[in-house]
Amino acid sequence: MALNQWMHPRNPYKTPPDFKAMAITFSDFRKFVKQDITGKVKLDFSDPAALACLATTLFKKDFDLVVEVPPTGLIPTLPSRLNYLLWVEDLLSTLPKQATESAKVRGLDIGTGATAVYPLLATKHFGWSMVGSEASPESLATAKENVARNKLDGKVPTSV
């Protein structure tokens, strides 16, 4: 998880998540953390299952999204994905006001993956309209399930 000086100023992940509080609240996440002798709670970032659980937990905690993150596919790092969308939002804010007043922001995520991370975040957090496309039938099926599970299927079409 990239938590550094290059994070967007409005990115809540500029301050690292509190793994200890997350472990108390989310029992699935608790299974993947260990407390060291100083009391610091740590996650094994080399473990794909731990990373998938971290992503799932952050989706729920910070965006109220219930997302299946298969540990066998690409596991999105939410801080960097949100960072990208915040920079896009900044770019959109530079457009003349009359160009953005009546226009709805629409985006296309080519290769959306199983989590459909950009469409889910853009729709839920920013209120944008997104289309996700995916070549892998397995990833597309999971992406569609993730969109439907969050009752966004009318707002986030997904296709091959």
Can you say where each PLM-predicted feature lies in the sequence?
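Secondary-structure boundary elements
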Residues: 94, 124-129, 149-155
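Gly/Ser/Thr-rich loops at beta-strand to alpha-helix junctions
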Residues: 74, 80, 112-116, 137-138
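Conserved class I S-adenosyl-L-methionine
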Residues: 100-113, 129-131
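Conserved SAM-binding loop of SAM-dependent methyltransferases across substrates and taxa
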Residues: 114-128
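S-adenosyl-L-methionine
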Residues: 135-160
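N-terminal auxiliary segments of SAM/dcSAM-dependent transferases
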Residues: 1-75
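Conserved alpha-helix/loop element of class I SAM-dependent methyltransferases that forms part
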Residues: 53, 57-61, 79-106
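Glycine-rich phosphate-binding loop plus the immediately following alpha-helix
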Residues: 125-127, 131, 136-139
